[in-house]
Amino acid sequence: NIYHGCVHNMLHEKSEDILKALYKSASFVVQAIAFKETRNYIKHLSELRNVVTYEERTIIEIFLNLKNGGTVDFHLMSEALFAWSRKRIVKGSAL
């Protein structure tokens, strides 16, 4: 679960590699959410950014940045993922 992994990583591991893996997982969740809402599978994340919410766009953009070798801002990126995953749980979406 992304939420649990994020909390554990923020408190204990503080691993950039774990954070990157969590963002990769989150990108698949965003893709699934978009499919559920639109009934249209969007393969490319660059296209997915155009049909998702602001928070989900942020998750995709951070993941793409990390995937392309971008710098990790551990605190900021962890907080963004934590807030997004918490919100998805409250809304009732499985993570």
Locate predicted features.
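Conserved nucleotidyltransferase catalytic core and NTase-mimicking acidic/glycine-rich helix/loop elements
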Residues: 1-95
